[in-house]
Structure formats: C-alpha cells, structure tokens
C-alpha cells in the first residue's frame, strides 16, 4: 500500500509542476517594452516615459500682448487647480510685451488644468509645445524609427555626401565638365547682380533676420553684423555647425570667392537651433516676436516640414508678414516626389523657393506641389512661387574660406539676398509705403522667367530674374493681382494637369485655385462677386462658381474657380476664352482720403470636347483618403524605412500623377470626387476607382454603391493595402514633440471599412502582409506590403501567387502553420455581379510614384477595360483562375476596427455630416446627394466614441480603456477590466508588446490545456482504481 500511495501521488506532483510552468511562461514572457520598436534610445526611454507621466510643457496663447509677468499674474489669480507652473524664459524678447506663456502641467491633472485655462476670457488657446529637429525629412526615420523632434527638412548638403537627399532618384542629367566649371561661377553673376551694384545698390539700410544656427562675431566675410541673439538653451552665440554662416554668406558675404548679393545688408543673426539642430516652438515664437518688435525688413527661414496644422507656428508666421516683414523660406528637399511642399514655404504670404541646377532644370531634390491643405474638397495652390539656383552654390565657411552646398535651403538665401538688394533700390523714406510681402512677391513672380519643360507645380512662376523684378519695382504702384494670372490649356506642359484633359459637359467641376496678392494693404476685401467675361458666344457654355475669403489677410487671399460646361455644350468642340475680373479694395494709407482699389484679371483659355462615352470615364475617390497631418497614417510599403508617414496627398496630381498620365494616354478621362459616394451619378461613369483609402463609409454610401454596381452597371476597381493590428501596435512610438504616444490611426488602408463596403458583393480582405515578385503573362510586378483576399464568391476569377507573409512572427508561424495556410494567398479578384463588374487587388504601391519598385499600370488598364467595357483579358480570365465554389471565412476572423484610438478626429465620416461639398456637381451642393436631396445628419458608427475635436490634431490619443473587446485575434490587446480580473498579472500596457498577442495566448492556452489533460488522466486513473477496489471487495464478500 505504501508503494501504491507514493505512485498515486506522482500525478498530483506532475499537475502542480504543469500549473507552475503555465504561470511562469506567462509571467516570464518577453518584455512588453522594446526600445528599438519604440524608436527611442535605451538611455532615453526611462527619462522620456517619466517625463510623459509627470510633466508636459504647454504654450498658452493670449488675446493681447502684455509683459510676461502680467500674463503670469493673471493665470495665477484665475486658475484654481494645482499641478502646474509658469516657466520663465530669459532671452532678448523679455523686455518686450508677449502674447504667450509656457507652462508645465502635471499629466495626472492636465485635463482639469487645461480645461480651466481654456475657459479664461483672455486666453486664445492652449497647445502642446513642439520640439523641432532640423533633419532631412527622408532621414527623419532611419530604419523606420522616428528621431526626436518634429519632422523638418534638411539643411543644405554637399554633393556626393550621404546627406544628399534622393541621390539615387535624380531626374537630372548633367555634363560633368560643365558641372565643375559652373561650380566656380558666382551665383551673383548668374543673376546679374553686378548691374545693380554699379548703380550703387548694395542692400544698404536693410535689416535682414537670419533664423538659423548663428554666426561668429568676428567673421571676416561680413561687413555689418548688427546683432546676434541666442534663443536656445545653449550658452553661445556662435555658429558651431556652419549652416547659419553659409546662409549669411550667400545673402551678404563680401569674399571675392563667394560673394553675397547685398554686402551692405545689416545682419541680425537669430540662433534658433542648437548644435544638435534642435529647436522648440517657444523659441521660435519669442524670436518671431523680437523680429517684429525690432522692425526687421526681411527674414530667411531655410527650414520646413509637412505639418501645416501646427497653429501657434503657422499663425505666428502670419503675424510676421502682417507686420510687413518679407519672409523667404525653402520649399523642401523632398523631391522629385510630388505633394511634398514644406511649411511655412507653402503659405501664400511667404515666398516659397524651389531649386534648379546650373542647366535650368528643376533640381531632383526640390519638393514639388501642389499644396495639400485644401484636400479633399478643394484643390491645391501653385507652389513654389519661384525657383533659384540651389546646386553647388558657394558660400562662407564657419570661420574663414568658402565652400559649396546644395539644397532648397541654399536657394532660399539666394532669393533672400535678391530681395535685400531689391529693397535697397527703393528710397528708405518710401520703402514702407511700397514694399511689403505682397508687392515683393508680385515683383518676383511677374519678373520671373518661365522655364521650358517643368509644370507650374514644379517651378511656380519660373526662375527669378533680378533685373526684370528691378524694373517692375522702379515703377511700382500699390495694386492687387492674381497668381497665376492665366490658365491656358494650350500651354502644355506648364499648365499640367489641366492641359492634359479638356473640359466636357457632365463632368465634376474643374477647380483652379489662385492666389490674390494685395500690395495695397495688409487687409483687403472683395468689393463685389468676381465676374466672368467670355470673349465669344461659346464662352456662355462655361458655368463658373467662385470661392473667395471675406477678408484678404495678411496681404494675400485666394480665388478658387469651380468650372463646369453646361448641358447644352455636350456636343461642343472648340476653345473658350475670356477673363475673370475681381475688384479688391483696402483701407486708405496714411495721408489718403479714400480706400485703395484695384481690379485683378485672370485670363482663361480652355479646351472643350463632347462628353466622352461612359466606358471611358473614371471617377477617382478622394474623399475617403486620410493623410498626415493631422493623423499618424503609416506608410503603405513597410519596406520603406526612411519615411513612416503617408503625407503626399494620395491625389491624382501628387503621388499618383504618373498613373494619371498613363490613364490619359490610354484614352480614359479621370475626374475627382472629394465628397461622399452619394454625390455622383453612376450612370455617367464606367468605373469608380478606389485606391489606398483610409476612411470609413456612411451607410448611405454602402447602400448606394451596391445599387450602382448591381443595378446601374457601374464598374468598381479597388486597390487595397495592408492592415494588421499587431504590426500597427509595433509601429507605436513615443514622440517627445507632443509628449504623447503616436499610434497608427489605421493600416496602409482601412480594411475593416473596405470589407463593409464590399460585403454585399461577397468580397473581403484579410490581415496578412504579403511581399514578393510575380508575373502575369510576362509582366513583372512587385507586391509590396499588400493584403490578401479571404472572401470571394463562386463564378469569379481569383489569382493566387507564392508570396511571403511578414505579418506573423517566426513563433506564430511555427505554431499556426497548417496545410491550409500553406496555400498561395489570393491577391487579385475579378467578378461580374448583376449589371456591373468588380475588380479587387490587395496592393497600391505599384500605382504610387512615391515609393514604387515596379509599376502595375498594365494591370490597372486590364482591370479598367474589364470593369468599364467588359473586355476580358484571356490570362486574367483563364479557366484555371475561375472559382467554382466560394472562398469563405468566418465573420469573426475578418480584421476588425481598432477601438483604442480616436479615429473620429481624423475621419470625414465618423461623427460627421453626410453632405455634398463644392467639389461635386453644382446641382447637389449642400445636399446628401443624388436621390437624397435633403440636408445630412451626423452619423456615428458602432465601435467609435466621440472626442474633443479642439485638441490633439497632430497625434493620436489612445484610450486607456478600449470601449469593447471581441478577441485577441481581432483587436490585439485586452481590456483593462479583463486584465484586472486576473489578479493584476496583466496590468502592463498590452499595446506595447513586441511579441504577438495571439501567439502568447496560444502558448499559454496550450500549456493550460496540457495541464487539464493531466488532471483528466489522474481522474480516470482514480476512477479505474476505485472500480477495481469495489470489484475486489465484492469478490471477497462473495
């Protein structure tokens, strides 16, 4: 019996060991924090997390300028909450009144403190203080990790160095011997500056503010360094990097080997960047205020970045120009990509400068337009304003001697030097009456030489012509004008993209967005609605709706033309010419009795054709695209490591411009819809093209699209992108600009939303991230971080390819690999349903010119031929690809929305009104759309919670407690309530985990299941032994 007792206790000991191992495996799992994935240096992790949990700096903007101590006393007397303090700023601006203060606020009570401050009568707003890091935008994300600081463009760079942006994407071919010769040519002589020098104009008595890295007081290249100020936290006025010195040399250097344009210009060096190229918003705001107080004439800022929603910075730039300071800024070094304009150069009141090489070609590094502020309902403005030489420009070294640098941050001081020279042309007594940001821009753009080849969104008005601008200023009288002043459909390629597609009746409005330059005053008004004056009878076929601001301030405004051909012009072929005039007036200047008035004119030369057949018309969905700013929208291709943001606009005329040209070459006509899908008439279009979309859909849109396809015969082509919760979790990082965690709002595309849209067609995408090369009928293509098709109806054609799935870790693959998962994933599907046809593909990188490896324009054309004209390519519609049974997946296995992020902040759908905006046909403006001509109502879809839209526009605020939870597979993290129910073992932030959440639970479940099996075995053994004892006892009794 003793031996039996020892043996029987063994299973119990085994059970205890199994349970112990189960708990240990979970508790000793890989750390949930991984510095590399959080994009922070290990030594900084603890400090940054600690700072994030304790104190955050906020900028408090006031409605009035007062001494800083008065603002501090006001806050201390009004704010009753604790946990905050005033931060003293010791700098040269201290002696002047200010309109802002900087506070530290403890994280634990920030909501109460910020709310109380925002309700104060004298407070304008409250914003998190930003930190700026001046680095190449493409280099802001080494190995896919964000560097500390706000994303900004690079300083200038030396050719051939690693810092040369886009070195492998240059679109310029240079003759090397000529290149070396040109390198020795003075940039001043290339613009003819010596002609003005001979007339005695050298920039005298012009106050030039250089916002950069400082300058040395005893530098021999400069005649008049009037003042040096330091706005950083470093105790030095000197330039230890060399960039500020170089910029000053281009503007005002006097060394014969690297002459500046205006050697007698008075230099005011504002050191706003540290030696590590770091700056803070408050430093800029103080320095800007000081520039205003000390009455600067010109200001050069050779920086820029994509965030045009940093309101304290943007609005302070407006205040700078409103104070009659002419600001010049670099347009950015993110070329040759389109849609990459940098702020503040993209503001209409700033002179934005692009770069050209010595052969008058647009430099490969120079950012291209259009501006993207206006999307999706409007259209971008023309930027840059002008271009200037920016490759191998000679300038001053840090202490003595000369060197050459390249970049738009070099082209910017070239123009700033020209501006200083032009300012000195006007007698000092008349300068403030004649010169201002608008009149100087008028002189530059009207005098510029248009280059042959580049379009208006690459070169603006063209190359700066110093002597022509000089002639304009000599006879200048205050007036208003429009830029560009002409839209000519015969002037291709300058008028691209307009000249690529004629107008026709029934199309969505063509929007042309112009800038009003008001040289008459800082404030102006439109006297009466703009007027269209056709040059001939045919001009009456054109219908124009105008949009313009109530007030033109500071110095600039906009005039947007929304143009349609009337229905009676459906068969017209020819040209329409005429002028649009707009009358502008400003208050009288000092000594004048009446307002200043001016009539601006915009010349139109438009081509019109008969309305194309339905099969040749494509509608592009712009409305459901979300970009940065304001949301953290991750890159589409995860292989691209130097750019983590999707910020190029995703527009036909930005990063999809090559695709647009291809479709036009193929005979298709493409129109843009910036409103919901209820706002177009499906009978007019062969195909709705939906590419790389991140937003959700109104229920009315889903219902209408189903009817449009099945009953109206609309074709539908969808190019999706990756969506994987675990990958999005890993892309989360702590941003020391905003002292907050950034997490992707969605994946490369919003797959859960697309699946809702496609559900009525029996189609759904999955959450795999697929990569690899494949070919169809000899056409090679690269699948770059695309998704898979997991649901597809019978009767359609579905194509699979052997692609690598990078969405699973090695551990997950080992555990979950089954026979079914070894099948090649489906990525391309074609389907006839009802009267319409649908084509879906899981990757859009092959259409996006920003980070394309190989294009798939050939595939897009085949899909459009099918969806619009029912032309079936024999390879795509091979019998081997036909599905005789549906591909089915359980609803619970489909990718689900993330409920731990405030998606409504960035969405045009969630919590918003369904309404057709001014980009849609005139007849449905302000309605819910076709057959729904009533005002829309706010809609909130299930699974989303509302938030305060007044703050947090530049980052994603994560919910501490997700509102609901479905499964680890669907959402990727546990609810906090569930965590607490397990004895506090799971109280860490699960969203930080680098190890896949489903994997961990499967491992744990496997171990626990093993333990349960052991217990069952023990129970069965005991049952058998019990029966044996009873049987033995019965036998003895017998």
From Swiss-Prot:
Pfam families: MBTP1_N, MBTPS1_3rd, MBTPS1_4th, Peptidase_S8. Residues 31-181 form a propeptide. The chain crosses the membrane at residues 1001-1021. Glycans are attached at residues 44, 52, 171, 175, 230, 300, 513, 579, 902, 954. PROSITE patterns: SUBTILASE, SUBTILASE_HIS, SUBTILASE_SER. Residues 1-30 form the signal peptide. Residues 182-1000 are lumenal. One of its GO terms (biological process) is hyperosmotic salinity response. The active site is at 212 (charge relay system), 243 (charge relay system), 409 (charge relay system). Residues 1022-1038 are cytoplasmic. GO terms for cellular component: Golgi apparatus; Golgi membrane. CDD domains: Peptidases_S8_SKI-1_like. Disruption phenotype: Short root. Mutant plants have increased sensitivity to salt-induced osmotic stress. Expressed in the vasculature of roots, cotyledons and leaves. Keywords: Glycoprotein, Golgi apparatus, Hydrolase, Membrane, Protease, Serine protease, Signal, Transmembrane, Transmembrane helix. GO terms for molecular function: endopeptidase activity; serine-type endopeptidase activity. Interacts with PME1 and PME5. Serine protease that catalyzes the first step (site-1 cleavage) in the proteolytic activation of various factors, prior to site-2 cleavage. Part of a regulated intramembrane proteolysis (RIP) cascade. Cleaves BZIP17 and BZIP28 after the Arg-Arg-Ile-Leu (RRIL) motif. May cleave BZIP49 after the RRIL motif. Targets the membrane-associated BZIP17 factor, which functions as a stress sensor and transducer in a signaling pathway that resembles an ER stress response. Belongs to the peptidase S8 family. This is Subtilisin-like protease SBT6.1. It comes from Arabidopsis thaliana (Mouse-ear cress). The gene is SBT6.1.
């Amino acid at each position: 019996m003793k031996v039996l007792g020892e043996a029987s206790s063994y299973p119990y000991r085994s059970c205890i060991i199994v349970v112990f191992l189960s708990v240990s495996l979970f508790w000793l799992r890989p750390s949930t924090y991984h510095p590399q994935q959080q994009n922070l240096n290990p030594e900084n992790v603890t400090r940054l997390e600690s700072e994030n949990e304790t104190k955050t700096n906020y900028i408090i903007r006031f409605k009035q300028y007062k001494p800083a101590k008065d603002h501090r006393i006001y806050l201390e007397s009004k704010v009753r909450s604790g946990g905050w303090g005033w931060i003293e700023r010791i700098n040269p601006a201290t002696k002047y009144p200010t309109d802002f203060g900087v506070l530290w606020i403890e994280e634990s009570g920030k909501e109460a403190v910020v709310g109380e401050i925002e309700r104060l009568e004298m407070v304008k707003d409250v914003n998190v203080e930003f930190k700026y890091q001046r680095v190449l935008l493409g280099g802001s994300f080494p190995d896919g990790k964000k560097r500390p600081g706000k994303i900004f463009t690079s300083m200038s760079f030396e050719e051939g160095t690693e810092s040369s942006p886009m070195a492998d994407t240059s679109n310029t071919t240079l003759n090397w011997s000529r290149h070396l010769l040109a390198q020795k040519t003075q940039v001043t002589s290339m613009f003819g500056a010596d002609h003005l020098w001979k007339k005695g104009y050298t920039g005298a008595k012009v106050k030039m503010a250089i916002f950069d890295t400082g300058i040395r007081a005893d530098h021999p290249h400069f005649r008049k360094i009037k003042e040096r100020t330091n706005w950083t936290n470093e105790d030095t006025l000197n330039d230890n990097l060399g960039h500020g010195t170089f910029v000053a040399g281009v503007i005002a250097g006097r060394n014969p080997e690297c002459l500046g344009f205006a050697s007698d210009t008075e230099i005011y060096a504002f050191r706003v960047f540290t030696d590590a190229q770091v700056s803070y918003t408050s430093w800029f705001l103080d320095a800007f205020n000081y520039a205003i107080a000390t009455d600067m004439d010109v200001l050069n800022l050779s920086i820029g970045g994509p965030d045009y929603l940093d309101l304290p910075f943007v609005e302070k730039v407006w205040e700078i120009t409103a104070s009659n300071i002419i600001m010049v800024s670099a347009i950015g070094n993110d070329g040759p990509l389109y849609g990459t304009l940098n702020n503040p150069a993209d503001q209409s009141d700033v002179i934005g400068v692009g770069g050209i090489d010595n052969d008058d070609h647009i430099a490969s590094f120079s950012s291209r337009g259009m501006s993207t502020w206006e999307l999706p309902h409007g259209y971008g403005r023309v930027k840059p304003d002008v271009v200037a030489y920016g490759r191998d420009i000679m300038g001053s070294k840090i202490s003595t001697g000369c060197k050459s640098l390249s970049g738009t941050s070099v082209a910017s001081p070239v123009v700033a030097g020209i501006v200083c020279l032009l300012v000195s042309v006007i007698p000092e007594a008349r300068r403030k009456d004649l010169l201002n940001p608008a009149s100087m821009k008028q002189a530059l753009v009207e005098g510029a030489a248009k280059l042959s080849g580049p379009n208006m969104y690459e070169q603006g008005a063209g190359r700066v012509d110093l002597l022509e601008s000089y002639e304009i200023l000599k006879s200048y009288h205050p007036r208003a004008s429009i830029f560009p002043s002409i839209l000519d459909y015969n002037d291709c390629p300058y008028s691209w993209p307009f000249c690529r597609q004629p107008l026709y009746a029934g199309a969505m409005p063509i929007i042309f967005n112009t800038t009003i330059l008001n040289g008459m005053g800082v404030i102006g008004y439109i006297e009466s609605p703009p007027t269209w004056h056709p040059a001939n009878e045919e001009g009456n076929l054109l219908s124009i709706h105008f949009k313009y601001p109530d007030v033109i301030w500071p110095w600039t405004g906009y005039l947007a033309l929304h143009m349609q051909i009337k229905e009676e012009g459906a068969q017209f072929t020819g040209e329409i010419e005429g002028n649009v005039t707009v009358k502008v007036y400003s208050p009288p200047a000092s000594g004048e009795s009446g307002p200043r008035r001016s009539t601006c004119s915009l010349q139109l030369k438009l081509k019109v054709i008969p309305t194309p057949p339905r099969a040749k018309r494509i509608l592009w969905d712009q409305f459901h695209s979300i970009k940065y700013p304001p949301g953290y929208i991750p890159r589409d291709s995860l292989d691209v490591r130097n750019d983590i943001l999707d910020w190029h606009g995703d527009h036909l005329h930005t990063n999809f411009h090559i695709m647009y040209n291809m479709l036009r070459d193929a005979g298709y006509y493409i129109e843009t819809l910036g409103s919901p899908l209820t706002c177009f008439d499906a009978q007019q279009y062969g195909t709705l093209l939906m590419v790389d979309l991140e937003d959700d859909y109104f229920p009315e849109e889903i219902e209408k699209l189903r009817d449009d396809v099945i009953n109206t015969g609309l074709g539908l082509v969808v190019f999706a992108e990756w969506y994987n919760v675990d990958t999005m979790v890993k892309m989360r990082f702590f941003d020391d600009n905003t002292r907050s965690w950034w997490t992707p709002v969605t994946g490369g595309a919003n797959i859960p939303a697309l699946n809702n849209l496609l559900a009525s067609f029996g189609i759904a995408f999955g959450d795999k991230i697929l990569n690899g090369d494949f070919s169809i009928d000899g056409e090679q293509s690269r699948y770059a971080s695309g998704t898979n098709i997991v649901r597809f109806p019978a009767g359609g054609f579905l194509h699979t390819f052997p692609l690598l799935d990078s969405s699973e870790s090695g551990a997950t693959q080992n555990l979950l690999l089954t026979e079914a998962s070894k099948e090649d994933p489906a990525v391309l599907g074609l389907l006839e349903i009802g009267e319409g046809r649908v084509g879906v593909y899981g990757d859009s990188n092959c259409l996006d010119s920003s980070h394309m490896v190989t294009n798939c324009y050939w595939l897009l054309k085949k899909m459009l031929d099918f969806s619009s004209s029912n032309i079936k390519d024999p390879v795509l519609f091979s019998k081997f690809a036909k599905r005789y049974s549906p591909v089915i997946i359980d609803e619970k296995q489909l990718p689900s929305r993330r409920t731990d992020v405030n998606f409504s902040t960035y969405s045009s759908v969630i919590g918003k009104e369904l309404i057709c905006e001014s980009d849609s046909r005139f007849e449905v403006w302000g309605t819910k759309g076709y057959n729904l001509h009533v005002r829309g109502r706010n809609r909130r879809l299930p699974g989303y919670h509302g938030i305060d839209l007044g703050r947090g526009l530049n980052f994603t605020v994560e919910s501490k407690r997700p509102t609901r939870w479905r499964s680890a597979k669907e959402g990727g993290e546990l609810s906090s309530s569930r965590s607490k129910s397990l004895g506090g073992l799971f109280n860490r932030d699960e969203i930080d985990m680098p190890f896949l959440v489903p994997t961990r639970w499967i491992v744990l479940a496997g171990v626990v299941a093993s333990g349960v099996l052991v217990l069952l075995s023990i129970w069965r053994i005991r049952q058998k032994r019990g029966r044996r004892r009873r049987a033995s006892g019965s036998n003895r009794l017998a």
